[in-house]
């Protein structure tokens, strides 16, 4: 109780933002929403400064930076290098770990702990509203296969996943 978390968003969010804010409230803490576009980040404040300063104010830094390949995870690691408090990935260009873990929890509740050879299908498609990040399907492929699931990903040919994370 009485903990403070900083939620830094580089793009819009509905479910991620509200689930983290609601979770902090339900646990007796407080979440501070930070829009990167209206904060000093937009004026060039470094990940080092963010990590050091926010560490002195609270108990956790949560970051969502997912739409620019090559930037999100790197930015989070830079903040974490300087922070004295946990830095949590709310979604980056490589992974959406909290959503992926929630999906895994739901699958285990429905199908049990032994997920060997369970077949799941994931679609990654066009949306007229905005570019769909690769982090959601990529995160599902990375995590679900570690639990022995057979994952099929349906996607347009020009939508490709990153090679390196899939090798891990």
Regions found by a protein language model. Give the residues of each.
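Phosphate/diphosphate ligand-binding glycine-rich loop within oxidoreductases
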Residues: 2-109
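Glycine-rich phosphate/diphosphate-binding loop of Rossmann-like nucleotide-binding domains
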Residues: 10-22, 109-168
């Amino acid at each position: 109780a009485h903990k403070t978390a900083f939620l830094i968003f580089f793009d819009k969010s509905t479910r991620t933002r509200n689930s983290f804010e609601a979770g902090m409230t339900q646990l007796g803490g407080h979440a501070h929403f930070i829009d990167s576009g209206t904060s000093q980040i937009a004026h060039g404040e470094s990940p080092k400064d963010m990590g050091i300063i926010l560490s002195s104010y609270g108990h956790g830094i949560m970051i969502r930076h997912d739409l620019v390949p090559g930037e999100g995870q790197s930015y989070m690691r830079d903040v974490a290098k300087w922070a004295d408090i946990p830095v949590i990935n709310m979604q980056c260009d490589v992974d959406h770990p909290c959503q992926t873990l929630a999906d895994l929890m739901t699958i285990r509740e429905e199908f049990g702990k032994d997920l060997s050879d369970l077949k799941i299908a994931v679609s990654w498609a066009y949306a007229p509203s905005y570019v769909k990040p690769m982090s959601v399907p990529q995160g599902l492929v990375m995590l679900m296969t570690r639990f022995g699931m057979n994952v099929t990903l349906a996607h347009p040919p020009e939508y490709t996943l990153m090679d390196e994370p899939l090798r891990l």
